[in-house]
Each structure stands twice: as C-alpha cells, then as structure tokens.
Amino acid sequence: MKEIDEVLKKVKRVHFIGIGGSGMCPLVEILHSKGYEITGSDNNESDTLNRVRALGIPVTLGQRAENIEGAEMIVYTAALLPDNPELCAAKASGIPTFERKEMLGAITRMFDDCICVCGTHGKTTTTSMLTQIFIQAGEDPSAVIGGKLPLTGTNGLVGKSEYMLCEACEFVDTFLSLSPDVCVLLNIDEDHLDYFKTLDNLIASFTKFASMTRKEVIYNGDDANTLRAIAGAKDKKFITFGLKEGNDFRADKIVLEHEFASFDIIKYGENVGRISLGIPGEHNVYNALAAIAAADNAGIPMDKIIACAEAFHGAGRRFEILKRINGITIADDYAHHPRELEATLTTAMGMGFNRVWAVFQPFIYSRTAMLFDDFCRVLSIPDKTVLTEIMGSRERNTYNIYTSQLAEKIPGSVWFNTFEEVADYVVKNVEKGDLVITLGCGDIYKAAKLMIKKLEKQG
C-alpha cells in the first residue's frame, strides 16, 4: 500500500492548494462525496471555484500560511512554486503533502473497475465519449476528464458505481501514479521530449503503464509505436482496435462527411452494426473504436453503445464550433502537436468550406524547436495560417526559437504579437463560407472570442 493510501485511511480534513485548477476539481468532488472534509485556496476567481463552493466547501482567495489550519493532509498542483507559503507551512508543521497526481492515483484505487485512457493524442475525446456511453447506458460512473463533457458541462463526475473512467496523461510520467484495471492505449507519438528526451524512453513509459494494468489492455493495433510498447507487456488479456484486417474491433465501409463520420463495426470478424458519429475525421474513427471496445469489454450491449456514442458530439475544445456568424464558422481545437494539427486540419480541409484559416499558438519552446519541420509541414495544409507568439509556459527560450522562424517557412503565413492583432487581421480578411479554427493548448481560445465579438459588432 502506498503512503498516500495509508494517510487517507487516517485523516478526514484535506486541504487543496490551487483548488481552482480544472484538474483538481474532480478530485475534490470525489473525496467530498466519500465524506472527507475539504478546504482549499486559490489565487484567482474562476468558474471552477464557484463549482467547488456550490458543494459547501470553504475556499480562501489568496494563499497564506494560516489557510492550512486544521488540515491533516495537503494536496497541491505540480505548478506550485516551492516557496508557496501554504506548502512551506505544511512541511514545517509535519502535515503530509502530496502532489495532485498522487491523489489521482489514490482515487483510482478506490474503485474496483478503473478504466484509464492513455496515448499521445485523442485522450480527452475518447474518455469523454466513453463517459457519455457509460452515463447514458445507466452505469453511473465516476470520471476524471481532461476537458469538459458537454453532456454534464464538467470535466469530472461523481457516480455511485464501481466504475472510474480516467484520462491518463503521460507527461512527467503522471500516469505511472495511477492503478488501472483496464488500459486503453490510443497511440504513441514523439511528444514531451523535453522530459522523455527520446522516443524510446517515451515508449518505455507506456510499456510500464500497460504492465501495471490488472486486467485488459485495449490498444491500437495499427500504430507501430504502440505495438513496440505492448511487446514489452506480458501476461495480459489484449484487445486490439484499428482499421486494418486482423484487429479485434475494426471499422469497415468508412464514410467521412462534412461534420460526421460513419462506419460498420466489425467485432471479431462479425458485423455488429453501423454507427454514425457526430464528430468528423478518421482520427475520431480510431477514438470511437477505442471507446466502443472498452464499453463492450465492460459488458454494455452493442446497441446501447452505438446509440450513446452517436449522441456524443465532441468534448470541449475538440473541434468545438463556437459560433456561426455572417456566414463564417468560428471553431476552437486543443491540437498542439503536429500529428494532432495534421488530423484536425486535414479533416477541416475536407469539410467543404470556402477557405480554412488556422490560427495557431505554438506551445513551449522545446516542442516547437524539436518538431520544427513537422510544424511547418502541417501548418501549410490550410488555406490561411496565422501564428501567435510561442507560449513558453514552464520553459525559458534556451532554444532561440521564434514564431517568425515558423512564418518564414510556411507559405503565405502571417504572425502577430497579440490576440487583438490576430483578431483584427482575421476579421478584416475573412470571407463568407470560411472556417476559422483556433488551435493550441494555451489560451488561444481567447482570440476566437475576440473574433466573435468583432464580427458581432459588424452585424
């Protein structure tokens, strides 16, 4: 038994530093439902804080040493600085302190059936679709998702069953703190190389995660890197999905339409039904197959799986249509890696719009530098490309990489320092019938909102 599990058995009062973080809120809700007394603090007001307060949980704005008074355990976000006054006070007082990923791991062990969805791309969409299937099929799951599920309007769920559906992120090996009963492995691609350094190291982490899984490992049988990872995992029940012959769950007679995708579901060689997805693109065919295989493995009847999956129309910030105004469609997507951008932009280009505008915010210097050529290639797919400054986040620009260098290599692209400039340029030049899609895992969605405001003023 891990230290955090022992502590949770002994305590009742848990204090969250950074309780307003979107990744913290589902953990707070689940612990609260299990009878723990929760308190928390944050530096900024947010919708998430209001959601926490609605549960009757006291929240302090601002972080001070006295906020931890009475706490028997501290949970903090990975982004917290080591000199945070509450964290320092807790350590000085001998109060057990744990990072968010450790608490998420402990929560996965509170359930008999924890299904963890991992992979470089598609985690949020797949976890969201799977959660919707479980909810609408009457399974009453708990869930921790990396984005908002439109059905519930939240990124977490507290259910009464023993099912826990959890998005499992590989960054800094976060997922190795979890305890999966079932692993759903979507794909593996070069990412987070600032941490993993090499693709081999990244694959090795996924091998560890698959090996930790207690029951079934459901994986993409078409993905070469995934096959390498799975080769190192022994003594598991394996279930494959993909488009190629030989996969246990396969899509056949695929039709990719304007905003939809449909295909026949082939389960162990038998056609078990046709599904029409409310989300576009071949990449979402893979995501749907993964969710279908996981739901089927849990014993949900196929007719229910199909009906529930068809009712799913995407997760927040995953090709999310924000507004159709003056004949112009404004959308937003979380894509920030070349493979994700390629999937999203290729899908967008096939949807019949007059022109497709990609408004991209590069995220972190290391990724931009290491995958520079790939970014230049995929950002040449749309008709128009608009770039913002690189969002450095946790990094300093030791790579001497700048947006202007990307723009030089992408034909016809432009770049701007501010979202205001981006919005002004797009609104001035966009035409009826165009799709404008903001792309990135930072705050580029703010540029989309600015565009909408400016278009509304035009009338």
Q: For the regions a protein language model found, what residue spans apply to each?
A:
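Nucleotide phosphate-binding/pyrophosphate-handling subdomain across enzymes
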Residues: 2, 6-15, 23, 27-34, ...
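Short internal beta-strands
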Residues: 36-43, 216-221, 357-361, 382-392
